[in-house]
């Protein structure tokens, strides 16, 4: 328990007002008359009193520095300036470039102190707010206006939505302060050109922990509040009106409530009335600093002029009442299980040191047993952690296996999509074959394979990751994130008319840090593993359904392959039919040749004179025609054998025909001597030549059609062969993949069953271990209680032994004196 440190500072008087009526002597301030005679009723003593010549540096060194150092060590701290308007509060807290105020000096001193502490690491967060017309505004984030005050069981009183900046050096904080000062409300009155129209609170949250063994040490969290209050004012003096008048009303109201709170807290009687913290936003925020867990200092500033005497007296009365308030400041620590275990070890060592030198071997043995049990407990914890990590690793392997199954299913989907594409391609090809002329359109590009459109992976196999990680927020948590938070209006309704004892309200009981039972944490592990096994079973069911659908698609693909095979057989039959056309033409030419020979024989039999020109002409024509028919047979045989192309067949036939025609013409010219025979021969020759030309053209056109049809059929046959080969490969791949999926499914089922069995065994082992651990912990507590009882009994016996020894000694002395007196 310690009292609030209170100091009074007198600002220098204005040049036109003359000397000050307040006299400062050591730590006492008194009011003197104009003749320099003191007024006995106007004298006050405080922890520190600073006269007109004091500087901000001296105020900080004597008043605030110890609180700043305590805040670095883990204590809550608060410093604020109180007084009337124009008395120097803002100058004391903010200062100037040549003489920085308490806020800037505190910021620099905090970081200097941190650099001197090498065995701990620190994290500092700052926020800057103002209370303007009973509304809380964030000076670091202009958009955060009209913030609300809430209370949490662990955090205590806090402002929801207030922005907090994590800082690393003093310069960064000073820049934030300068940016916040720009957003603060100032105004001009008759008493002050630059008057503060709002209360400002600059807050630093300092967290620290040890560097050597951070996992086994407690975390210290302290809050440092540096408050610059707006000054109380009288309307008659300030001449305020309009907005300034409204601001002055809210300022005077909050300061009046602050005075009431100080008055209630300074009452020394046991039965104190209800303390109205909730009547004002200012007192609600400063509740821990006023009669709570904090080291607090108040700087009361007064004006030395004669016309401000009444306001100065009121300020001194406020300071006198505040001086009687006591706080119970303690280090704020967050204890982990490791830190609690470390402290228990230290307590055991202290008990061991106390028992040294006494006859307590049994107790020493018990302490040793407790230490061994504690060691076993630590080893058991490590073993459980190792098993948990092993289970997590196995779970990760199962997830990887499931992902591999997903990839394989994606590949099967791609194969099925490719097969569907090929089936559509085959259907388009069959339709394109059935043109009105019965021929294929070779210029049609619809059968050209394109890039297949693969299906996207099924979303049912995608495992959603839980992002449990959340970085450090820039703002305090909002009220909806805290389940046990009551808002300000609810607290106001609950506390109206309520009268409570200050001893019950003033102090916050220390919450004991009890270790969380491990059974609660560990019994959730089998449930979680069971849910994971159920999830795996559902995924296996999905894989089975997908496999069935793939089997159906595979059957469809087999049916499509059979249809393609039937189409291929029809195409082969048509190809054989086309290949038989040259044979038929060759047979027709042979028949024509035989008929022609019969006609020639008949004509020769009709000619009696074999030496006549007609006989000679008939003989030459017979030779030429026979040669022509033989040439046609040779060309057809070449076409059937596929030894020549179309271009190599046309030119030899036409050249040979031209040669035969020239030979026929020469023969007729030599053989025909008379004009009548010549005319008859020419007429018959011209008719035969025209007939032969027509036959030649007809044969050429038929030959061209046959070649085109043959080439088209060859192309169709090649394309059908390619489609058939692709279908066979796809069919074989699908069969292999289905077989592989069945094997993978069976292996996955075996793995899941094995994992389930292992999880059950591990869960049973964990339950047994936890039961043993609880038994050991209970036994350890019982032993500690026995040690305490034995220590108390030992101390009692020791006291009785000492008293008995002193009594015997006194009796011995009496006997000695009696013996010496006896003659």
From Swiss-Prot:
Molecular function per GO: ATP binding; microtubule binding; microtubule motor activity
Domain Kinesin motor: start-end pairs: 3-325
Entry's Gene Ontology BP terms: microtubule-based movement
Recorded GO CC terms: microtubule
Keywords annotated in UniProt: ATP-binding, Coiled coil, Microtubule, Motor protein, Nucleotide-binding
Entry-linked PROSITE patterns: KINESIN_MOTOR_1, KINESIN_MOTOR_2
Signal peptide stretch: none
Gene3D superfamilies hit by this protein: Kinesin motor domain
Residues binding ATP: 83-90
InterPro entries: Kinesin-like_fam, Kinesin_motor_CS, Kinesin_motor_dom, Kinesin_motor_dom_sf, P-loop_NTPase
Recorded coiled-coil stretches: 341-414, 527-557, 696-786
PANTHER family in alphabetical order: CENTROMERE PROTEIN E (PTHR47968), KINESIN HEAVY CHAIN ISOFORM X1 (PTHR47968:SF36)
Assigned protein family: Belongs to the TRAFAC class myosin-kinesin ATPase superfamily. Kinesin family. KIN-7 subfamily.
Name of the protein described by the UniProt record: Kinesin-like protein KIN-7N
Gene this protein is translated from: KIN7N
